[in-house]
From Swiss-Prot:
Its cofactor is pyruvate. This is Phosphatidylserine decarboxylase proenzyme. It comes from Geotalea daltonii (strain DSM 22248 / JCM 15807 / FRC-32) (Geobacter daltonii). Heterodimer of a large membrane-associated beta subunit and a small pyruvoyl-containing alpha subunit. Catalyzes the formation of phosphatidylethanolamine (PtdEtn) from phosphatidylserine (PtdSer). It catalyses: a 1,2-diacyl-sn-glycero-3-phospho-L-serine + H(+) = a 1,2-diacyl-sn-glycero-3-phosphoethanolamine + CO2. Its EC number is 4.1.1.65. One of its GO terms (molecular function) is phosphatidylserine decarboxylase activity. Is synthesized initially as an inactive proenzyme. Formation of the active enzyme involves a self-maturation process in which the active site pyruvoyl group is generated from an internal serine residue via an autocatalytic post-translational modification. Two non-identical subunits are generated from the proenzyme in this reaction, and the pyruvate is formed at the N-terminus of the alpha chain, which is derived from the carboxyl end of the proenzyme. Its main location: membrane. Binds 1 pyruvoyl group covalently per subunit.
Length: 213
């Protein structure tokens, strides 16, 4: 979960190895078209599962983005799991974004949940309620609670989330990923001082979404 210095996410290595092996076989038997196709596939998989280094801001009260992408929703909303009003920030990840998810703030996992569901286009707000998702409830040393939810999308149908209840997480570290286009919903306390607006591009582990009070 903390292999931040590995250039390719370990979850992608089987896919890279498989595509590279097929490429090699086609090269050996002399099928140039097939070899060229799978070389391109191999390069794309490496690109998709890339794991760039990130520099996390020093401010311990800062909540950093858990995902690379663009802010598609920002405003008060009812968080379904805790059943309370919170500030919601939704980030859309296209197939071209880095899909490794990072911890938004140093905290302990106090609860987690999984909801089976559909695989609708995650750019629609209905995906928050209808799509398959995995969520973590985080609590900081100061008792501040946040919820971060990985939402599967039309293409992304495989959510990877490593932490379990009781796990202590460090801000900016890897905690999971979603494959091939998806969405992250982050729920913050209502009094959080927001640092992003609709349409902003975010970088996981670096972009400050807000500052807790």
């Amino acid at each position: 979960m903390r292999n931040n210095n590995v250039p390719i996410a370990v979850e992608g290595l089987p896919f890279v190895a498989g595509a590279a092996l097929i490429s090699a076989i086609f090269i050996i038997i002399g099928w140039k078209v097939g070899a060229a196709f799978f070389i391109v596939v191999t390069v794309f998989i490496i690109f998709f599962f890339r794991n760039p280094k990130r520099v996390t801001p020093a401010n311990e009260k800062a909540v950093v983005s858990p995902a690379d992408g663009v802010v598609i929703y920002l405003g008060p909303a009812r968080e379904p799991h805790l059943d309370q009003d919170m500030m919601k920030i939704s980030i859309f990840m296209s197939v071209f974004n880095v899909h490794i998810n990072r911890v938004p703030i140093s905290a302990r996992v106090v609860d987690q949940f999984y909801r089976p569901g559909k695989f609708l286009d995650v750019r629609h707000e209905s995906a928050t309620f209808e799509n398959e998702q995995k969520g973590l409830v985080l609590e900081t040393a100061n008792g501040i609670r946040l919820v971060v939810v990985q939402v599967a999308g039309l293409i992304a149908r495989r959510i990877v989330c490593y932490p379990t209840i009781g796990t202590m997480l460090r801000r900016g570290e890897r905690y999971g990923l979603i494959r091939f286009g998806s969405r992250l919903d982050v729920y913050l306390p209502l009094d959080t001082e927001l640092q992003v607006t609709m349409g902003d591009q975010t970088v996981a582990g670096e972009t400050i979404l807000g500052v807790t009070t």
